[in-house]
Amino acid sequence: MAKLKITLVKSLIGRKKEHIATANALGLRKIRATVEHEGTPQIKGMLKKIDYLLKVEEI
């Protein structure tokens, strides 16, 4: 599986609680925070849920 570099590019203020919880579960708490995860189906599902807040790159 490919490694994914995930960056939070929009604020979590005013978002649905579920979307904030998803971002926090990915390890994203501040704007421009970046994490790396494996491209598992679980991670891809989380990314799809909040894709409007993120920038995702394959490494």
Curated annotation (Swiss-Prot):
Keywords recorded for this protein, A-Z: Ribonucleoprotein, Ribosomal protein
Record-linked Pfam families: Ribosomal_L30 (PF00327)
Top-level taxon of the source organism: Bacteria
Listed InterPro entries: Ribo_uL30_ferredoxin-like_sf, Ribosomal_uL30_bac-type, Ribosomal_uL30_ferredoxin-like
GO process terms (BP): translation
One GO CC annotation: cytosolic large ribosomal subunit
Stretches of the chain forming a coiled coil according to its record: none
GO function terms (MF aspect): structural constituent of ribosome
The family this protein is said to belong to: Belongs to the universal ribosomal protein uL30 family.
NCBIfam families for this protein: rpmD_bact (TIGR01308)
Assembly, per entry: Part of the 50S ribosomal subunit.
HAMAP family reported in the protein's UniProt record: Ribosomal_uL30_B (MF_01371_B)
Name this protein carries in UniProt: Large ribosomal subunit protein uL30
Organism: Clostridium botulinum (strain Eklund 17B / Type B)
